[in-house]
């Protein structure tokens, strides 16, 4: 399995200048290849990445004097990215990809962030004095390394965040880590309308802290100040504007780190308790373009799904009629609309909480695909309409509820 390790690094001013030069040349490589492709398409000529590379190699010494100072491994990785971008675009046009991929675009010098990848030709290692050695031209880089990446090295990426911090991501190929094998499975229903973030088939409801909403007033205040300091028509803004822009970026970074930390803890606790986690196969990209776009981004359900996928066993099922179907008898009630949170089955008179019922149906769909067929009527229901047999009062559940109250 491929695993990435991220470390904070502290390059010197000379090393920062080298990284910016490398990023600039990689951007020129990308834009040159894209320009050659567009010219070939207009003239009905055959074109490939190798042809554009040869054309650029001929004019490279005349275009940039310091091009020979750049590491060739970073340029090789850039060509791999160009090839992948065009291949993904062509596959998307032919319908060979699930998600739509747009055509590659030119990279702007003004708005592009520093992100440089080195291929397997580089051999990163940690020196005894706590420095990272990636390439000879870059030299040893000071960093914070709590642990090192174990496995076969694939590639490394150095990037600079909008706040000016530098990080290195080392991707390695290692043996899969042992996962939970206790045989337990749980269904999870995602809720973007109410306070409950996810509802589990065992009756657990997890509230989302909504970190972006908590910081919205402070963020709005800082963004207004930044907007007032922006002068339209100026190519280079004032120092006060860039300082204020840094403050806004720091706030966004804090919110993102809070959300990521909370989701890591939540996903780890779910995977420790259950071997299989079943969720609905929802297109979050479409959901984000609707009325709940800001909530979808603030909750981070897509990030939670990805975390569960590599920490445990994630299964996606068809979300059709999960809220309208009675988990006791299987009757589909067409009267259950979006705003109905509690309803009674007209067929078996069972009372349901909309989200818990949906989570149970999600789990039933997975069980049916595994050959476990049949629905059992619960002996009794609780105040919310959830089957008493499905609500487990464990220490594990109370710790979940504590996530939303922090």
Model-assigned labels for residue ranges:
Residues 15, 22, 26, 71, ...:
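Hydrophobic (often cysteine-bearing) scaffold residues that line and stabilize catalytic clefts
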Residues 7-9, 139-147, 206-208:
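Generic detection of short hydrophobic beta-strand segments and adjacent strand-loop junctions
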Residues 51-161, 253:
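Acidic carboxylate diad motif detector
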Residues 1-77:
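Gly/serine-rich nucleotide phosphate-binding loop at the start of the catalytic core
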Residues 33, 77-89, 356-366:
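Stable alpha-helical structural segments in soluble proteins, enriched in small hydrophobic residues
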Residues 8, 115, 123, 155-157, ...:
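Short, surface-exposed charged micro-motifs
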Residues 150, 162-406:
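Positively charged, helix-rich recognition surfaces that bind polyanionic ligands
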Residues 34-37, 41, 86, 90-97, ...:
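Long, hydrophobic, amphipathic alpha-helical segments used as structural scaffolds
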């Amino acid at each position: 399995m491929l695993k990435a390790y991220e470390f904070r690094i502290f390059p010197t001013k000379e090393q920062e200048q080298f990284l910016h030069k490398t990023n600039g040349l990689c951007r020129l490589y990308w834009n040159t290849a894209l320009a050659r492709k567009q010219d070939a398409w207009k003239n009905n000529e055959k074109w490939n990445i190798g042809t554009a590379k040869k054309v650029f190699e001929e004019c490279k010494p005349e275009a940039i004097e310091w091009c020979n100072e750049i590491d060739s491994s970073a340029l090789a990785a850039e060509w791999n990215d160009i090839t992948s971008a065009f291949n993904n675009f062509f596959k998307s046009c032919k319908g060979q990809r699930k998600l739509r991929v747009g055509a590659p675009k030119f990279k702007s010098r003004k708005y592009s962030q520093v992100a440089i990848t080195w291929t397997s030709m580089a051999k990163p290692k940690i020196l005894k004095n706590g420095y990272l050695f990636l390439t000879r031209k870059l030299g040893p880089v000071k960093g914070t390394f709590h642990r090192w990446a174990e496995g076969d090295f694939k590639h490394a990426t150095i990037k600079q965040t909008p706040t000016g911090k530098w990080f290195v991501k080392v991707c390695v190929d290692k043996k899969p880590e042992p996962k939970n094998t206790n045989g337990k499975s749980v269904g999870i229903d995602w809720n973007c309308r109410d306070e409950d973030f996810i509802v589990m088939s065992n009756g657990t409801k997890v509230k989302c802290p909504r970190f972006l909403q908590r910081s919205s007033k402070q963020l709005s205040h800082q963004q207004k100040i930044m907007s007032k300091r922006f002068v339209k028509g100026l190519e280079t803004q004032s120092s006060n504007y860039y300082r204020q822009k840094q403050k806004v970026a720091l706030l966004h970074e804090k919110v993102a780190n809070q959300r990521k930390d909370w989701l890591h803890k939540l996903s780890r606790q779910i995977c420790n308790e259950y071997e299989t986690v079943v969720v609905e196969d929802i297109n979050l990209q479409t959901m984000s373009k609707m009325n709940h776009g800001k909530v979808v981004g603030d909750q981070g359900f897509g990030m939670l799904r990805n975390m569960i996928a590599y920490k445990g066993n994630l299964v996606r099922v068809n979300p059709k009629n999960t809220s309208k179907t009675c988990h006791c008898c299987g009757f589909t009630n067409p009267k259950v609309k979006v705003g109905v949170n509690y309803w009674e089955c007209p067929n078996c008179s069972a009372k349901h909480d909309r989200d818990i019922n949906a989570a149970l149906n999600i789990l039933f769909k997975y069980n049916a695909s595994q050959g476990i067929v049949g629905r059992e009527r619960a002996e009794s229901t609780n105040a919310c309409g959830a089957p008493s047999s499905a609500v487990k009062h464990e220490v594990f559940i109370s710790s979940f509820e504590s996530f939303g109250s922090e």
